């Protein structure tokens, strides 16, 4: 079906992002939007292209506030029953009265074992869906509507911005067919820039957490469980706190044994609204509120990410609390709201991400982990982050082992190069000292990373025809100790990939 008689948009963020959903409605068809907006507010959220299509094609436009209806009835975020009822009231696939009765009969059969209260709750949702529809009068002026605000230009590394603007943004607006083959010229080898997910800002959550700084225990459990790295603690110096946006919330007392101001920054436009952070908070300092009322907190989150430095004395691997001050190198993925996989993977990147290789089996973790042009794996301010690759479903163990053996072989050659330089009479004392420090820390990831940086700096200072030096500098990314991981689900681990047979 390329053109339908009825299309419904169940998430208002799709309207705000400008998805071309209404273009799939036949002329004279019906378009239903689930939202909390009044007709006047709706007009502000529809872009010019959507308005023009509705007006020029005589689309019948309706809204329904299934979000508030479901919450009021007691169904929480489960709007599907309300929206199913609205569908039958508008789509005319069955006489609407018959459809409503069938829905109620099915609800009674399905939920009777859970009690009459649950049955009644669903019956109320069914009635509410058909009764809460609002017909929107389409102004004639929509046919010539024009967008007044120009889209904001992307900022960041040139290659990343080019990929975001030419591939990610059109695809994200359901306009993938407009992308020319030339846009993929930089990616013919299958590699894509890291960190693109930070540009999506999808705003898909209707409800997001808001933080009460007065009652917060600074335990960081919320950040520890957040699957999407959208709630993060930051330690601010006096200067950073003073320069923060005026609406930045700050804990009344500094972080223990420091002078740093504590803040918990939340990204409402990246949050998925799962509520896992709410459940884990021991002091109930987080509550769910409508996202639109929290959108001013996005500036606070963006400031903290861009301008607040990581403090080594509080950002350590030692505890749950300290680990969450470290930058996650997996953020804003497309995994399901509340996904536990991404919580684990995100934590691993906080501990090892700047020197991490990942071999990923095909499955959920490859879908949220490696979507083309929207990678959620990112890099730190020095440009280091996880190197990620996906082979097949059945050979992930071999693929990961190959990664490990390959990088080890290159590193062992470089280690011999370092030994050659360290034993050379021509090497300066500074170069020899850097070589010795490197060789003494080979199996310590953190210490070796620092020693590698110092060694490369010393070798870059000198000018000689030494083959060992040239080999090291040409392959310096392999010099430090790496952390190799194999990610996969139970289908790979216990079924297809179990015997290692391709």
Label each region the model flagged.
Residues 99, 112-271, 278-485, 491-492:
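Ferredoxin-type iron-sulfur electron-transfer modules and their immediate structural context
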Residues 1-171, 241-246:
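Active-site cofactor/cluster-binding pocket
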Residues 496-502:
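A short alpha/beta connector and helix-capping loop motif
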Residues 5-7, 29-32, 59-62, 80, ...:
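Structural motif
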Residues 15-18, 46-48, 68-69, 195-196, ...:
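Glycine-rich, charged/polar anion/phosphate-binding loops
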Residues 87, 228, 497:
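Active-site-flanking alpha-helical
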Residues 12-14, 37-39, 67-69, 107, ...:
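Acidic, glycine-rich active-site loops and adjacent beta-strand->loop/helix elements
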